[in-house]
């Protein structure tokens, strides 16, 4: 919190009221895309994390980010699914057997820590 150059960031998973309202009024697959439509802007960065790479809510979020002029990066597991294809060149993929959620989640956690330290070292 004492950093001279803080990084603006937010989690689209944290607002349970928004998630519930969007899922109820539209559908669950739109919970992130609709938030991005309101909050995202050109030049922003979207990072999505998925074991399978096939979650409709994340695929729609990447589509919305593209419409808004945002860049999308993904962390995927198993075979990477559709997210790996949508974010070619902007994907960190952990190849694991399908169903090995623990391995993927642990690897993604470690990768997120590395990314955080890289951002801190630049700022």
Spans of features found by a protein language model:
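Glycine-rich phosphate-binding loops that contact phosphosugars or nucleotide phosphates
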Residues: 1-123
């Amino acid at each position: 919190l004492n950093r001279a150059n803080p990084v603006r960031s937010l989690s689209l998973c944290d607002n349970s009221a928004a998630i519930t309202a969007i899922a109820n009024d539209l559908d669950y697959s739109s919970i992130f895309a609709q938030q991005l439509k309101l909050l995202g802007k050109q030049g922003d960065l979207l990072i999505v994390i998925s074991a399978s790479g096939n979650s409709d809510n994340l695929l729609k979020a990447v589509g919305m980010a593209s419409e808004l002029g945002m860049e999308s990066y993904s962390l995927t597991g198993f075979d990477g699914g559709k997210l790996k294809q949508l974010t070619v060149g902007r994907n960190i993929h952990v190849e694991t057997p399908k169903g090995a959620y623990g391995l993927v989640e642990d690897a993604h956690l470690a990768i997120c820590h590395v990314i955080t330290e890289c951002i801190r070292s630049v700022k």
